[in-house]
Every structure is written in structure tokens, then in C-alpha cells.
Amino acid sequence: MLFEEIVIFGCGNPLFADDGFGPEVVEELKKYKLPDNVKVIDAGLGGPHFLFTLMAQSDEPVKKIILIDIADFGGEPGQLARLSVNDLPPGTYRDPHSWGLTEPLHMLKDRIDITIIGCQPKRVTEPDFEIGLSDEVQAAIPKTIQTILDILGVQHGTEGTAFKDLRNEREEGISTIPCSN
């Protein structure tokens, strides 16, 4: 099977400071024991466009996508927002190399449940290289992990494990997620 039932994509480039948020969340999430039907992918840069296109043409049963990336929604650095594809007008969501991601997301939204978790960046240094997240964005990673686990309907244990919970919650639209623990 090429994809699992639930796919989590971490998007971004760690060479441009806070743009590395998605890949950092993916690395942290890989420390957890997740349900067998969940696939976690560091989609990097530009890759999301191709992955979404491939998935749209695939017969494999992907039911849910969780997309983790930075998003400038006017919040405080490190603040999280949970968005649906309908919150993204066509042409508004682009990666740093100008791949339009809104259109592939809209193409998939009628057959795949898509949630976007965006983190307000403090700094994105493109074209200059700067490795490492700002303190505010780094501090948002634990809350992002908890939000992902909540979306998946799992609770995490004390040692980086996760176990299945039978909750089935779903929210629509933009909602900000407080970053305090």
C-alpha cells in the first residue's frame, strides 16, 4: 500500500528558520507509537503538490490528511490555527517556491477529510539560510502534537507512546489553539 488511511504531512524547509516547523513536528511525532493506519511524512518543499496529485490519482483509501505548516494568519508568533480547505481561497496557500497548494487541496477535499494546522511564524529567512526555529515556534510543537493526537482520537502516554481512544471529534473552520500547556 502506497499510503495509509490517515496521512500526516509536515511541510516546510528547515533551512529558512520557522519554515522548518512542519518537518520538526514530523520528527517529534515519529517518536510516538501511532495507530497502524497512520502514515507520517516529511513532505519538505514542493513535495506536497506532487504528493497531493499522486494521491488524487491513487486508488488507495486515504481518508484523512493532516497538513502541518507555517501560516501567516496575523496571529502572535507560535500561535496555532486549525483550518479547513474551505478557509483557503484558491491561490492563497503557496509554499516558498511558489507551488500552488490550494488547488490540489480543493481537488481532494470532497473525498478526503483535510485538516491544516498552521503555526504563525516569527521569522522566515528565505533566501538567507538560518537553521533553527524561533523560541515561540519551537514552543508550539508540543501543543501541535497534542492537537494531532486529538484529531486522530488518540491520547498520549507518559513516555512518547500513544494509544487509541474511541472519541470521534471533528471541527470545521478556523479556530486558534492556545499554545500554553
Regions found by a protein language model. Give the residues of each.
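Nucleotide and nucleotide-moiety/phosphate-recognizing core
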Residues: 3-8, 14-18, 23-85
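A short glycine/serine-rich beta->alpha loop
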Residues: 11-15, 90-91, 130-131
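Conserved active-site and cofactor/substrate-binding residues in soluble primary-metabolism enzymes
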Residues: 20, 24, 45, 96-99, ...
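Glycine-rich loops and low-complexity Gly/Arg-rich segments
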Residues: 32-35, 64-68, 89-93, 106-108, ...
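Helix-loop-strand module that forms the ligand-binding subsite of alpha/beta enzymes
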Residues: 70-114
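Phosphate-binding/catalytic loops
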Residues: 101-181
